[in-house]
């Protein structure tokens, strides 16, 4: 079987159907075909239909702009669908109430209002005892996602879209930068333009950082009240859970967020988690009838933002990775992608979501995907020795989580005057581990644009870090993104994470409780955790016991250049640790780096002292030499300290 169309869309969920409908509305004679693996498995079914950019607390930037633009279109968009099909979509711009259990740090958004404990309970009686207030987001709303997808499917068919159900795409055939055909279990399909909109399954066809995030959900039946139809009248978006009342008396409870690959089915643990969170938010629902529960796979990406725009071939367009916002972003995605296909019109909204954003840089790319070696080769720098030798003459290698390194100096990538200076400094230092702030790289923060691609990751081991995370939950989420970022850059087996949980914005001191909590979870998930901590011997021991690969006590506050102010505690940590000890933060001079190594530290991590030096490249070399000298001195053993002088030459048998 061979079928030819003007546009072939791979994926029959809400995004694929929305694009198909938009194309046909703009150009009726266009031949559009949609290939759907299994309509029932679409991520659209594993959703609650919330239109909630403010309740989701999406940070200001391109993603929020995209979400707001889509929400603004929603009323007109669903009205058009309802007119086409005569079907309801359940669209309701009802506003969303966001109860909280802890006092907020600042305003949620300019369009949102804070409600104190008394006021929020007036708005919605029956909230749990732990609720201390909440935000009212008047512009957010909801839609019945199942009704919406059914209406889209009906609209597509009525407009003449050919929907091929039960078709599994096996490969995308390419030649000379063009897709020539899509190969499936039911034959080949050809078209002038192709759209990849198959969510989590995209990575099976192209090497894209899209992965399944399992979500479990359930529905309860609300009892009808005497004076009001149902006891819960408002959408509640609480901490880690949401409750969405439908007009037919159902209450949608969601959702878990689990990176368990393709593990199917609802689980007792998942349902227990849902119920526990929901009952804490609204206790009365603990007595309501369970009507249904289900699960599905949301398409996640390393930065939790979609891929929109041209793919690796000129006639292939991507519309994938919408994660938690597929329902919300359907109208704007359909508009942007249809404009791209029909008019080659690239909206400013789409630029930040280019599929190339993880792979492009204004600097010459040095990205390599060659296999990583078990022992990293020494960087070519004739000024530095490869590694110290112990008394038996064998190489003295640094070993972390089973991986061996010649260099004991780790460096960072921030604060450099330019990307070129950073590249030259890394090379000059002789280091083999470079830490990268996941959040800043993913958001292209100032000074971090193109940073991930500026380093040859075939010779440098990436150490993703969770800088900027104030809670354990944040750090765990960012660690997972860091692992995916490392995979994308060719280090498929990189499970390292430098764990930073820092709520203190003045002194940047790490939170010991949050660090321990995050470390325990990340170790369970298979990470090699390198935790940044205060020089606390008891905490260091506890982190070692939960399975951390190293401990990284600070010498003094980050970026202070104060040197090692807590040598006694670091010495205790070194004496008792059975994992490598890395002195991290505060080192300002090569002599201080050597001091840490002479104390018996296994490695040092130095960034600011190099990046902020008058000559960073020369300082990087000096730090590398000092690290080697300090290690060699430690292995050699210093002379005993004596109370009295002892001349180097004998005092007897002198001439004359």
Curated annotation (Swiss-Prot):
Residues 396-656 are annotated as: ThiG. 1-deoxy-D-xylulose 5-phosphate binds at residues 559, 585-586, 607-608. GO terms for molecular function: flavin adenine dinucleotide binding; glycine oxidase activity; thiazole synthase activity. SUPFAM superfamilies: FAD-linked reductases, C-terminal domain (SSF54373), FAD/NAD(P)-binding domain (SSF51905), ThiG-like (SSF110399). CDD domains: ThiG. It catalyses: glycine + O2 + H2O = glyoxylate + H2O2 + NH4(+); [ThiS sulfur-carrier protein]-C-terminal-Gly-aminoethanethioate + 2-iminoacetate + 1-deoxy-D-xylulose 5-phosphate = [ThiS sulfur-carrier protein]-C-terminal Gly-Gly + 2-[(2R,5Z)-2-carboxy-4-methylthiazol-5(2H)-ylidene]ethyl phosphate + 2 H2O + H(+). The keyword Flavoprotein applies. The active site is at 498 (schiff-base intermediate with dxp). Pfam families: DAO (PF01266), ThiG (PF05690). It comes from the Bacteria. It is found in: Cytoplasm. The keyword Cytoplasm applies. Glycine binds at residues 56, 298, 324. Its cofactor is FAD. GO terms for biological process: thiamine biosynthetic process; thiamine diphosphate biosynthetic process. FAD binds at residues 7-21, 48-50, 169, 322-328. Pathway: Cofactor biosynthesis; thiamine diphosphate biosynthesis. NCBIfam families: thiamin_ThiO. In the N-terminal section; belongs to the DAO family. ThiO subfamily. HAMAP family: ThiG (MF_00443). Catalyzes the FAD-dependent oxidative deamination of glycine. Is essential for thiamine biosynthesis since the oxidation of glycine catalyzed by ThiO generates the glycine imine intermediate (dehydroglycine) required for the biosynthesis of the thiazole ring of thiamine pyrophosphate. Catalyzes the rearrangement of 1-deoxy-D-xylulose 5-phosphate (DXP) to produce the thiazole phosphate moiety of thiamine. Sulfur is provided by the thiocarboxylate moiety of the carrier protein ThiS. In vitro, sulfur can be provided by H(2)S. Interacts with ThiH and ThiS. PANTHER family: THIAZOLE SYNTHASE. This is Bifunctional protein ThiO/ThiG. It comes from Synechocystis sp. (strain ATCC 27184 / PCC 6803 / Kazusa). The lineage of its organism: Bacteria, Bacillati, Cyanobacteriota, Cyanophyceae, Synechococcales.
């Amino acid at each position: 079987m061979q079928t030819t169309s003007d546009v072939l869309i791979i994926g029959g969920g809400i995004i694929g159907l929305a694009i198909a409908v938009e194309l046909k509305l703009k150009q009726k004679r266009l031949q559009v075909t949609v290939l759907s693996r299994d309509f029932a498995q679409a991520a659209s079914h594993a959703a609650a239909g919330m239109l909630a950019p403010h309740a989701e607390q999406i940070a200001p930037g391109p993603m929020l702009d995209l979400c707001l633009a889509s929400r603004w279109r929603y009323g007109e968009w669903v009205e058009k669908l309802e007119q086409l099909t005569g079907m309801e979509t359940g669209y309701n711009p009802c506003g969303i109430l966001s109860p909280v259990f802890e006092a907020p740090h600042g305003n949620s958004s300019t369009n949102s209002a804070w409600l104190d404990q008394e006021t929020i309970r007036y708005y919605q009686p029956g909230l749990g005892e732990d609720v201390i207030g909440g935000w009212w987001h008047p512009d957010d709303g909801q839609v019945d996602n199942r009704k919406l997808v059914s209406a889209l499917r009906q609209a597509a068919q009525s407009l003449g879209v050919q929907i091929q159900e039960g078709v599994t795409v096996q490969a995308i055939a390419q030649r000379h930068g063009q897709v020539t055909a899509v190969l499936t279990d039911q034959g080949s399909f050809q078209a002038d333009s192709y759209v990849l909109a198959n969510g989590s399954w995209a990575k099976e066809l192209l090497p894209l950082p899209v992965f399944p995030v399992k979500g479990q959900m359930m529905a309860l039946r609300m009892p009808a009240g005497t004076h009001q139809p149902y006891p819960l009248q408002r959408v509640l978006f609480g901490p880690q859970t949401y409750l969405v009342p439908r007009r037919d008396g159902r209450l949608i409870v969601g959702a878990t967020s689990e990176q368990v690959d393709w593990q199917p089915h609802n689980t007792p643990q998942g349902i227990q988690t849902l119920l526990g969170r929901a009952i804490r938010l609204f206790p009365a629902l603990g007595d309501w009838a369970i009507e249904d529960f289900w699960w599905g796979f949301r398409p996640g990406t390393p930065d939790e933002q979609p891929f929109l725009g041209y793919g690796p071939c000129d006639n292939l367009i991507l519309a994938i990775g919408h994660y938690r916002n597929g329902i919300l972003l359907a109208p704007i995605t359909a508009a942007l992608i249809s404009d791209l296909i029909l008019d080659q019109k690239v909206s400013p909204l789409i630029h930040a979501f280019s599929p190339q954003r993880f792979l492009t840089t204004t600097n010459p790319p040095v990205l390599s995907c060659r296999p990583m070696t078990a022992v990293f080769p020494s960087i070519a720098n004739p000024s530095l020795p490869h590694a110290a030798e112990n008394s038996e003459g064998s190489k003295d290698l640094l070993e972390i989580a089973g991986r061996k390194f010649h260099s004991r100096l780790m460096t960072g990538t921030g604060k450099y005057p330019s990307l070129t200076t950073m590249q030259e400094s890394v090379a000059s230092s002789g280091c083999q581990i470079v830490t990268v702030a996941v959040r800043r790289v993913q958001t292209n923060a100032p000074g971090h644009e193109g940073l991930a691609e500026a380093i040859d990751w075939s010779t440098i081991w990436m150490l993703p870090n969770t800088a900027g995370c104030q809670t354990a939950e944040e750090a765990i989420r960012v660690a997972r993104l860091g692992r995916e970022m490392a995979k994308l850059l060719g280090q498929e087996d990189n499970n390292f994470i430098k764990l930073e949980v820092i709520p203190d914005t003045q002194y940047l001191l790490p939170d010991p409780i949050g660090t321990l909590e995050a470390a325990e979870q990340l170790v369970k998930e298979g990470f090699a955790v390198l935790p940044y901590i205060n020089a606390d011997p008891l905490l260091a021991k506890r982190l070692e016991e939960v399975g951390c690969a190293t401990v990284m006590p600070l010498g003094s506050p980050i970026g202070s250049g104060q040197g090692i102010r807590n040598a006694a505690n670091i010495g205790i940590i070194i004496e008792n640790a059975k994992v490598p000890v890395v002195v991290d933060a505060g080192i300002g001079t090569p002599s201080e780096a050597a001091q840490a190594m002479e104390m018996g530290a296994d490695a040092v991590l130095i960034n600011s002292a190099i990046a902020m030096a008058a000559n960073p490249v020369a300082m990087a070399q000096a730090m590398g030499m000092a690290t080697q000298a300090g290690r060699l001195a430690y292995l050699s053993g210093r002379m005993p300290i004596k109370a009295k002088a002892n001349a180097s030459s004998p005092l007897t048998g002198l001439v004359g």
